[in-house]
Amino acid sequence: MKKLLLTSFALLGAAFALHAQEDLTAAQEGVEELVNEKAEEKEMKTGWSFGILPTATFSVDNGFQAGAFGDVYYYGDGSTYPDPLHKISWEASYFTKSQRQRYYLAYDSKYLIPGMRINASLTYVRDPLYSFWGFNGPAAYDSGLSTSFTSVVYPVWSNRGTTPNINYFGMSRNMFRALANVQGRMAEHLNWAAGINFWNWDLADMRDPAVDANGDGTKTNYDHNVTLFKKYQELGLIKAGEEKGGMSVEVNAGLVYDTRDIEAAPNRGIWAEAYLNGAPYSGNPSTGFNSPYLKACVYFRHYLDIPIHIPAGDPVFAYRLAWQQTIAGETPFYMIQNIPLLVQRNMISEGFGSSGTIRGLRENRILAEGMAWANTELRIKLVNFKLFNQYFYLAVNPFFDAGIITKPYRSDVLDKVATNGKLYDTRLISSDIDWSKSETQLAPGYDGLIYDSSKINEIIMSSGIGLKIAMNQNFIISAEFAKCFNETLDGGLWIGIGINYQF
């Protein structure tokens, strides 16, 4: 009996000990699970998020910018974060130097229609002092001046209040654009894409207000007869019927391959597009001018995570290879600066030069029927932090850009009017123009050279660095500084301030 009682107590004690151990183990597992949940807590946004900033920026082309811009994001329950369910972008601004006005409203969503992506926007730009640099980039000017292109051409031909009163590269344009693009799924990461764009252009001489340039009470305008815009019309390089602008109805269709982990600032993945963009009608109804065209466009973007595990996040090496070329017809003068994109990341996508393509060049400095370019940059996050319940990070992006013309614009007409491949404007050396009163004088012996076909195939290169401040991984403020290595294209220190990475 005694042995039985001892055995019973032993079994009861063992059971109690086992139960206590199970409770202790469960408690420990609960604590560990709580710790792990805390450790694995990640950024998440739900509902609406707003980003708005004043457009207090500066650019060499347009001067100081005043106005506001921003993005509106809707994340819903946060399950798609950092990608929003819906994104609305907008801007309203004015530039002091070029007197440009910009108004922009855009919508982008992958979730409005299941299985499809919708991108649509409205844009209006008024440019009373738009700069037209000529055709075919490096060929459109020559370094045959006493000093660099920067120190001579820009001050003399762009400054008001000097004698002569000339802005040689000046003209005006107003642009209205409405676009809508749709993408649908074909297979994993592979989409079809199609869209339609409507453009309306109004071109003219400069619309500059008369000013008292010399302080004597006499108000004057720039000399509208001494401009490259007028010279190209006289030579037939800008055709009769298109010199006042026109309308274009473009359609595009192609394929998109996308494996990016985050759209606004990918850490890894590929984003590639191949499509055709054409205008069955591009003309001016009032003049009867019509010049339909078809372009082929290929873009390849690759984002490579560098796993060195720094606290702010791994650096990313990103590069873009791009090519677009007219393969049928001829692009009208008022459309030649356009770079068609399936997904419009910025308000304006124009020209071989400036923030959209080759940083370090003046805006729309290269105009050609075919262009190829490459952009490379290293995106390095310096620090991330949380402020006002928003997630921020600070990053830098040193970069190198390069490009080349693959198909010149209207080279056949240029060959006919040029002498040994060179084109001159003798008005620039006329005795009727008193250069002696200008702040910076043209070099003695300058012969008025404005085009040299031998430079068409020159490789264009630039380099610089950017600074990024990102909120919730989507609203990204960008400031970039660059310098062009080509003497005849160098416009001094280039500054670009806006939103988003370039690609």
Question: Model-derived features: where do they sit?
Answer:
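C-terminal outer-membrane beta-barrel translocator/porin domains of Gram-negative envelope proteins
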Residues: I262-F388, T406-P408, D415, D425-S436
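Transmembrane beta-strands of outer-membrane beta-barrel pores
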Residues: F58-V60, V72-Y74, A92-S98, Y111, ...
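Surface-exposed extracellular loop regions of Gram-negative outer-membrane beta-barrel proteins
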Residues: A68-W90, E250-H302, G464-A479
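Membrane-embedded beta-strand positions of outer-membrane beta-barrel proteins
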Residues: I52-P54, I88-A92, I118-L122, W192-A194, ...
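Short loop/turn motifs that connect adjacent beta-strands in outer-membrane beta-barrel proteins
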Residues: E22, E37-S49, G76-H86, L112-I118, ...
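Gram-negative/organellar outer-membrane beta-barrel architecture
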Residues: E43-F50, T57-M247, N252, F485-Q502
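Predominantly the C-terminal beta-signal and adjacent terminal strand-loop region
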Residues: L321, K468-F503
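Flexible, surface-exposed loop regions and adjacent strand-edge segments
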Residues: F135-S143, D208-K219, F289-S291, K295, ...
